[in-house]
């Protein structure tokens, strides 16, 4: 325990909180260009082919981002918007691609949770 005198001479320093999404640089979203679109497998005990994309952001950083929803139209050179949010079973994937914005199409035939997947309201 520090004495009062020691604290007067050198106050306590607040610990800096580390960001979970450093590439966003305190912005809600960032734009980027796909450099590679591929599938990868999750950690144990899960099993799937998860769709991910490597993205070069406007600030020059390159990140791996998850493509949510069923089916997508992304390929190399597609311009996308990314947001924060990690994928628990994919190590190193800390960002999500925003569906229904820029070059990313929304999920077709989506009835519930449409706003998360950029799907329009169905007719009737």
Curated annotation (Swiss-Prot):
The protein's matches in InterPro entries, at most eight in alphabetical order, are given as: NA-bd_OB-fold, Ribosomal_uS12, Ribosomal_uS12_bac
Any GO CC annotation of this UniProt entry: small ribosomal subunit
Source organism's superkingdom?
Bacteria
Q: Where is this region: Disordered?
A: 1-23, 103-124
**Any one GO biological process:** translation
Tell me which UniProt keywords the record has, alphabetically.
Methylation, Ribonucleoprotein, Ribosomal protein, RNA-binding, rRNA-binding, tRNA-binding
Q: What's its job?
A: With S4 and S5 plays an important role in translational accuracy. Interacts with and stabilizes bases of the 16S rRNA that are involved in tRNA selection in the A site and with the mRNA backbone. Located at the interface of the 30S and 50S subunits, it traverses the body of the 30S subunit contacting proteins on the other side and probably holding the rRNA structure together. The combined cluster of proteins S8, S12 and S17 appears to hold together the shoulder and platform of the 30S subunit.
Family annotation (HAMAP family): Ribosomal_uS12_B
Q: What is this protein called?
A: Small ribosomal subunit protein uS12
The organism encoding this protein is: Nitrosococcus oceani (strain ATCC 19707 / BCRC 17464 / JCM 30415 / NCIMB 11848 / C-107)
Quick one: which gene encodes this?
rpsL
């Amino acid at each position: 325990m520090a004495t009062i005198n020691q604290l007067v001479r050198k106050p306590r320093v607040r610990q800096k909180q580390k960001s979970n999404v450093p590439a966003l640089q305190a912005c809600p979203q960032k734009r980027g260009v796909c450099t590679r679109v591929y599938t990868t497998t999750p950690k144990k005990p899960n099993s799937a082919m998860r769709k991910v994309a490597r993205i070069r952001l406007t600030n020059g950083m390159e990140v791996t981002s998850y493509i949510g929803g069923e089916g997508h139209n992304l390929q190399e050179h597609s311009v996308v918007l990314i947001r924060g949010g990690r994928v628990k079973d994919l190590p190193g994937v800390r960002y999500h691609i925003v569906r229904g914005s820029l070059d990313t199409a929304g999920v077709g035939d989506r009835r519930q949770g449409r706003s998360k997947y950029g799907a329009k309201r169905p007719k009737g």
